[in-house]
């Protein structure tokens, strides 16, 4: 799966923060994927756009780690 960038989102409500990745969906222009690295990078959500993905993450009390990681 080739990506241009990804964001790191964390749930800090637990003793050890839980991490998810947010990245563009290469099979759906404008779409977003939420990936769980702890589950062997399994895609846990496919969402239609960035705003919907942000709402999904913030509803579950995830916060974005500052910055966006570029992939070369």
Labelled PLM ranges:
Residues 42-72:
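Mixed-charge, Lys/Arg-enriched low-complexity segments
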Residues 11, 36, 51-54:
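Generic structural signal for short, flexible, solvent-exposed coil/loop and linker residues
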Residues 1-14:
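Negatively charged, low-complexity tracts enriched in Asp/Glu with abundant Ser/Thr
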Residues 14-42, 59-63:
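Short aromatic-glycine-(Arg/Gly/Cys) micro-motifs in beta-strand/loop hairpins
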């Amino acid at each position: 799966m080739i990506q241009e960038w990804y964001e790191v989102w964390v749930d800090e409500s637990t003793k050890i923060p839980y991490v998810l990745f947010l990245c563009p969906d290469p099979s759906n222009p404008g779409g977003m994927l939420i990936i769980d690295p702890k589950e062997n990078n399994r895609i846990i959500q496919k969402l239609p756009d960035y705003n919907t993905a942000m709402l999904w993450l913030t509803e579950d009390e995830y916060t974005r780690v500052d910055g966006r990681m570029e992939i070369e």
